[in-house]
UniProtKB/Swiss-Prot annotation:
Positions of the UniProt region annotated as Disordered: 160-193
Function noted in UniProt: Catalyzes the synthesis of dihydrouridine, a modified base, in various RNAs, such as tRNAs and mRNAs. Modifies the uridine in position 47 (U47) in the D-loop of tRNAs. Also able to mediate formation of dihydrouridine outside of the D-loop of tRNAs. Catalyzes the synthesis of dihydrouridine in some mRNAs, thereby affecting their translation. Dus3-mediated dihydrouridylation of the mRNA encoding alpha-tubulin nda2 is required for meiotic chromosome segregation.
Pfam family, one: Dus
Subcellular localization, as worded in the UniProt entry: Cytoplasm; Nucleus
Organism: Schizosaccharomyces pombe (strain 972 / ATCC 24843)
Protein name per the record: tRNA-dihydrouridine(47) synthase [NAD(P)(+)]
Keywords annotated in UniProt: Cytoplasm, Flavoprotein, FMN, Metal-binding, mRNA processing, NAD, NADP, Nucleus, Oxidoreductase, tRNA processing, Zinc, Zinc-finger
Enzyme class: oxidoreductase
Regions that span the bilayer: none
Reaction equations catalysed: 5,6-dihydrouridine(47) in tRNA + NAD(+) = uridine(47) in tRNA + NADH + H(+); 5,6-dihydrouridine(47) in tRNA + NADP(+) = uridine(47) in tRNA + NADPH + H(+); a 5,6-dihydrouridine in mRNA + NAD(+) = a uridine in mRNA + NADH + H(+); a 5,6-dihydrouridine in mRNA + NADP(+) = a uridine in mRNA + NADPH + H(+)
Length: 617
């Protein structure tokens, strides 16, 4: 076996490419291309949306878009192909005359005019869920939406309302009731800002708390209207095949691809609560999903879809949870992100910043759970912010005692560590053991406890094979969440089901890319704008997908996510192209399915690597 540097994939010697030992290694780049240029290519000649699908325009002569179909088609970009993938599947194409595969569903009628074709049983059955309308977004911007339910719960969480004598916490000592929401881990005092209500600013009430005098009963209860056990939907998290929330690349077309390969639990991309409450349309687009994600999956379980939120403020978490619970039609659970390490999120007091403020973290969970109706709430955690200071061992007990959280996901890394070292699954195992012990004593909790269900623990970090998944489950967690591993190898869910490695050929991997593009065209549209959007996200996906090294080339079949292969010779020409780390080759692959790139098209991947170069088409 050839000698390999630490972190290198053990490639069989006959596939290795000999290198000049005197060649200077290029410095590895990390992080994100934060200042990358984004160019949105749009059609120069628009067509009325109603006319484009063969309908009459309700605005008629007052419409701001042209209605001349022949003039539009005369200047329209050439068709990419003569078979529309959407029409072939559904018998109808929602893009109409704007479709870049128009030849597949248009004819010239007896009057010499273009006419769209629709099969007798043609129906576009892919529906988008969790679409919040423009009117709701307008009311959010103008603060006209009724959020009184959230406001009353916020007041209760902050202890601003006197508890009803008949409430579940009436037997808590008076001095402990006001202190309950002000407990902070490792501190004797904490200031509770009224700014968290979203109403008052620059006013602070300080609450002196002696931790030694606060009873355990007071710590596990707050004066707010909790739901009865039967009013919360219960989720069995055991052995679920969970696809992690993935910023930029975790879009509905990618989630649909993973669903076809065995995933059954999905998250939206992380959405920030503040722009959601401002009615910011691009942020609300992150919440959307597909009806497909909640249908029966190949493993025999119904798929579930969650919405992940990030915020550091109680009023944002609670009010956003109310809006989503009341306005969205496809949410199975809400997730509070307390693990995001990104500076932009951390500096706002959100993400992993909440690990340093457990009192605020718990209040956010309490508010979300109380306002979300039947929708359960989950939380995403990291070990801590610093390598030498893990905090979850203490925090998980408070989450169990002081909230009704359905599940907690633990990423076995610190914020400081990012992805530079392997995830600490021994620590995850310790937390799993503690959660199991607490669940065994759930019947011993007082009747006025908020907890009405066991707490599930989901492990996360470095899952790249079926062996990693089962090793994680053997640590005691209910299931393992898969993130980057699914981007590099989307069929990892098939491997878990089969309990063996599956070596996909270059032809099979190319078919996956075609499926991804077709998913994108169905979701974003098969017009020019939809094609360009699909191409952009396809290239982001390729920045991970190209990293796969065929398992047949391994000398030792135990792939690790952070390992990088040395230069090797692939088994065929297409496999070589799929393994290329050049953006120009990724663009070439996109042209197989989406046609030539526009003249002004440029692309810089969000995630840096040695291979990244700007590509122009």
């Amino acid at each position: 076996m050839a000698e390999l540097e630490t972190g290198a994939v053990p490639i069989r010697e006959e596939f290795l490419v000999k290198q000049d030992g005197n060649k200077k290694r290029k410095r590895k780049e990390r992080g994100q291309n934060k200042r990358r240029e984004k160019i949105h290519v749009k059609e120069n000649n628009a067509l009325c949306p109603a006319i484009s699908i063969g309908n009459e325009c309700p605005y008629k002569e007052n419409c701001k878009f042209p209605h001349d179909v022949e003039a539009y088609l005369a200047t329209k970009a050439p068709d990419i192909g003569d078979k529309c993938p959407i029409f072939e599947r559904y018998g109808v194409c929602p893009a109409g005359f704007k479709c870049r595969w128009l030849a597949g569903h248009v004819v010239i009628n007896a009057d010499g005019k273009y006419e769209l074709i629709k099969k007798p049983d043609g129906q576009f059955t892919l529906f988008t869920v969790n679409t919040v309308g423009k009117e709701v977004q307008r009311k959010l911007r103008t603060k006209q939406l009724d959020l009184s339910k959230a406001e009353s719960i916020i007041s209760a969480v902050l202890g601003e309302e006197k508890p009803d004598p008949s409430s579940k916490v009436s037997n808590i000592p008076e001095e402990n009731r006001d202190a309950t929401s002000a407990i902070s881990e490792g501190k004797e005092t904490e200031s509770v800002s009224l700014e968290e209500t979203g109403v008052l600013k620059n006013q602070t009430v300080s609450v002196n708390v002696d931790l030694k005098e606060i009873s355990s009963q007071a710590r596990s209860n707050i004066a707010l209207p909790t739901l009865r056990p039967q009013e919360k939907n219960l989720i069995d998290w055991r052995d679920r095949k969970i696809l992690a929330p993935l910023t930029t690349v975790g879009n509905p077309p990618f989630r649909r691809l993973c669903g076809s390969l065995g995933a059954d639990t999905f998250y939206s991309e992380m959405a920030m609560c503040y722009p959601l409450m401002q009615g910011h349309q691009p942020e609300w687009a992150l919440v959307r999903g597909l009806n497909y994600e909640r249908e029966m999956m190949r493993g025999g379980r119904r798929g579930i879809l969650g919405v992940q939120l990030a915020t550091g403020k109680l009023w944002q978490a609670t009010k956003t949870a109310q809006v989503i619970a009341e306005q969205c039609d496809g949410v199975d659970f809400l997730d509070l992100n307390c693990g995001c390490p990104i500076d932009l999120v951390f500096r706002q007091g959100a993400g992993s910043s909440l690990l340093e403020n457990p009192g605020r973290l718990l209040r956010n969970l309490q508010g979300m759970d109380a306002v979300s109706g039947q929708i359960p709430v989950t939380v995403k955690l990291r070990m801590g912010n610093k390598d030498d200071h893990p905090v979850v061992k203490n925090l998980i007990g408070r989450i169990f005692n002081e909230t009704n959280t359905s599940a907690a996901t633990l990423h076995g890394r610190s914020r400081q560590q990012r992805y530079s070292k392997n995830a600490n699954w021994d620590y995850i195992g310790e937390i799993a053991s503690k959660v199991k012990s607490m669940n065994e004593r759930i019947d011993e909790l007082p009747e006025d406890s908020l907890r009405t269900q066991p707490l599930s623990l989901i492990g996360n970090g470095d899952c790249y094979s079926w062996q990693d998944w089962y090793d994680g489950v053997n640590k005691g967690v209910d299931t393992v969440m898969i993130a980057r591993g699914a981007l590099v190898k989307p069929w990892i869910f098939e491997e878990i089901e089969a309990r063996q490695f599956i070596d996909k050929s270059s032809t099979q991997r190319l078919e996956m890319l075609e499926q991804y593009c077709n998913n994108g065209l169905e979701y974003w549209g098969s017009d020019s704008q939809g094609v360009n959007t699909t191409r952009r996200f396809f290239l982001e996906f390729m920045s991970f997908f190209h990293r796969y090294t065929p398992i047949a080339l391994y000398e030792v079949q135990r792939p690790r996510l952070n390992d990088r292969p040395p230069l090797y010779t692939a088994r065929d020409e297409m496999e070589t192209l799929l393994a290329s780390n050049k953006v120009t080759d990724w663009v070439k692959l996109s042209e197989f399915f989406l046609g030539p790139t526009p003249e002004r098209f440029t692309f810089t991947p969000k995630h840096k690597s040695n291979s990244v170069e700007e590509a122009e088409g």
